[in-house]
Amino acid sequence: MKNIIRILFCSVLLVWATNIKADVQFGVGGQMGFVNTDGTETEGTAADTSDRSKSIEEFFVGADIFIENVFGNGFTVGVSYIPFDIEMGSGDRLDVDGSDAAENDNGTRTAAADLTDFYTIYGNVPIGSNGVYGLVGYHFATVAPSVSLNNSTYGNVDVNGYQIGLGKRDGNAKIELAYSDFEDIGISATGGNTNSVSADADALQLRVSFGF
């Protein structure tokens, strides 16, 4: 349902912008960069109520499709969608608990998380007359965790974020450097224990795109 709302919101924005004189472009983009994630897992078992924290930096390469309205003064409003998952990080650890069988939760635990269903609403604000512009954007995405716990699972959670950057347009081609910061998230396990995870992520990326 939230994905449908995102699509409808983006569509309404573009329809509104199209009613003003503008050049509508479809295109593809490619990006690469780094995503940094700081996460903390809080154990909720009787044998262990400790916190475990970890910071992970992942290099990523991706692609997107977009539609945008380019106005006569260079101001641009658009929507992009990344049809691939972006890995936020992964790791593992070996748990060795006490001898109490009721509280024993031994074994290797693995964890990973991806950003999926990634939409961005953005605007390009011209700076001068040489094609340079400021970039502002707002992200809509879903965090999909994959964690191995005995009889427990973590569900997906929706996350939003903002983006700022600088770019340069040359005809239908653009290159831009942007920083993204995502809101803090909290996920509680369901099933065998009451573990919870909190995380914060940000990203720095270089993107090249071409419109048709």
Describe every region a protein language model picked out.
Residues 1-25, 212:
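Cleavable N-terminal export/targeting peptides
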Residues 20-87, 140, 211:
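Short glycine/proline- and aromatic-enriched beta-strand/turn motifs that initiate or cap beta-hairpins
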Residues 23-27, 34, 166-172, 199-212:
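Outer-membrane beta-barrel "beta-signal"
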Residues 25-27, 74-76, 120, 131-133, ...:
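Membrane-spanning beta-strand positions in outer-membrane beta-barrel proteins
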Residues 30, 61-69, 79, 121-127, ...:
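Residues on the lipid-exposed face of transmembrane beta-strands in outer-membrane beta-barrel proteins
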Residues 30-38, 81-87, 117, 127-129, ...:
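Transmembrane beta-strands of outer-membrane beta-barrel pores
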Residues 38-51, 87-100, 141-158, 185-196:
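Outer-membrane beta-barrel translocator domains and adjoining extracellular loop/strand segments
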Residues 53-63, 113-119, 153-162, 169-171, ...:
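Residues that define the transmembrane beta-barrel architecture of outer-membrane proteins
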